[in-house]
């Protein structure tokens, strides 16, 4: 059994939607990123890679590589899963906390969980996503960006 932790941050930029957990959410800003900016899937990918001792997403999908420009983070997550399976691991469960003052996440969490479960080839009850604010403190509280903490448990396949 292995545990990994992931953390990612993206700042807001021009745009009218963000993508979190594969779900497109209308918002007054987008997220600045080389890929699609899905900070939730990036943190989950890092947690999974860390648990399997496979480095991090920067190693596997460098932002200096043009092939990952605008990349769909769901595709990247599925690639991470293949890497983990290749090392003899399977996902036990994942848990993530989105830290954002806005937009409100509650209406989208069920859809995020469903897509993540599909991409990780696990049951819905093996995926948890929750959201919190920082009570208007710090960069997320000032609505400058979004942060996500994620934890993954891997089991021998």
Curated annotation (Swiss-Prot):
Cofactor: a divalent metal cation
Gene3D superfamilies found in the cross-reference section: 2-C-methyl-D-erythritol 2,4-cyclodiphosphate synthase
Keywords: Isoprene biosynthesis, Lyase, Metal-binding
Enzyme class of the recorded protein, top EC level: lyase
Database matches in HAMAP family: IspF
Family, similarity comment: Belongs to the IspF family.
Protein name: 2-C-methyl-D-erythritol 2,4-cyclodiphosphate synthase
Organism placement in taxonomy: Bacteria, Pseudomonadati, Pseudomonadota, Gammaproteobacteria, Pseudomonadales
């Amino acid at each position: 059994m292995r545990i990994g932790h992931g953390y990612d941050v993206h700042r807001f930029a021009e745009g009218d939607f963000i993508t979190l957990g594969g779900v497109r959410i209308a918002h007054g800003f987008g997220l600045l990123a080389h890929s699609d900016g899905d900070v939730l899937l990036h943190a989950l990918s890092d947690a999974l890679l860390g648990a399997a001792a496979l480095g991090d997403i920067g190693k596997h999908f460098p932002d200096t590589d043009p092939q990952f420009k605008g990349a769909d983070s769901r595709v990247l997550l599925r690639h991470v899963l293949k890497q983990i399976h290749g090392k003899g691991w399977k996902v036990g469960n994942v848990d993530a906390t989105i830290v954002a003052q806005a937009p409100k996440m509650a209406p989208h969490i069920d859809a995020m969980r469903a897509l993540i479960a599909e991409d990780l080839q696990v049951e819905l009850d093996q995926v948890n996503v929750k959201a919190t604010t920082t009570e208007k403190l710090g960069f997320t509280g000032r609505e400058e960006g979004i942060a996500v903490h994620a934890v993954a448990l891997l089991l021998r396949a």
